[in-house]
C-alpha cells in the first residue's frame, strides 16, 4: 500500500503526498502552498517526482512553480484547464491513466465545482483524490455549471466500494457538519460524526481521509435519494435526486 501524508496548507487547504514504497515515486496532489509541501518532504525524506493537479484554482496551484523548481517534479494537470495551471508537463482527460511508480490512477473528469476538475482514482488501493468535488460531510460550490453537473460527478463516487478512502482538498468539516445537521437532524450516524468532528478539531486534526461508506451514511449531498433529504427541501420522497441536490446546494450557499 502507498504511504500518504496529509497536512494543512494556507488556512484550510489540505496538502497530500502519496509515495509508492516499491519505487520511491512520490506525488503531491495539488500544491496549495510551496512551503508546506517542501517542509513535509524534508520531514519524510521523500523525493517528489510528480505533481497531480485536480483543478486550476489558485489555491490549489499557487506553489507549483517553486516546488517544481526545487524538486524537478513532473506536473500533470487537466487538459481542460488550458494555460491556467503553471509549469505543466502533461495533460489528462477522462479515461487516461496516470502512473506513479507501480501505482496506477484512472482519471475521472468530475466537473461541477469547475469545468476542468478531475479526480484521481487508484482502484487497486481503493483511494480517490477528489479535490474540491467531494468533502467530508459536504461538496464543492457550483461555480461554472448547473448544479446537476456536480450531482452527476458525485454520483460516480456512489458506485465505489464503501471502504474507498476519499481525500479532499479542504477541511470544512465543522461548517459542513452544522449544515448537515440542519438538513438531516434525525440521522444518528450524522450526530455521531459531527461529535467526532468537534473532538478531532479540538485536537488540531482533521477528518481527512474519510471513507465513502461514512459519507453515504452522513453527507447530505450524497443522500439526495433519501426521503428525509427530499422532505428537508420541501419535496416529496422519490423526487428527482438531481433536483433535491440542487435545492440542498442552494440552501448551503445561503446557510
UniProtKB/Swiss-Prot annotation:
Q: Which family does it belong to?
A: Belongs to the metallo-beta-lactamase superfamily. Glyoxalase II family.
> Which residues hold Zn(2+) 1?
55, 57, 113, 132
Q: List the protein's name.
A: Hydroxyacylglutathione hydrolase
Assembly and interactions?
Monomer.
| Catalytic activity, EC | 3.1.2.6
Q: Which reaction does it catalyse?
A: an S-(2-hydroxyacyl)glutathione + H2O = a 2-hydroxy carboxylate + glutathione + H(+)
Free-text remark on how the cofactor is bound: Binds 2 Zn(2+) ions per subunit.
- Please cite one Gene Ontology biological process associated with this protein: methylglyoxal catabolic process to D-lactate via S-lactoyl-glutathione
- List required co-factors: Zn(2+)
Species for this entry: Methylobacterium sp. (strain 4-46)
Q: Which Pfam families match?
A: HAGH_C, Lactamase_B
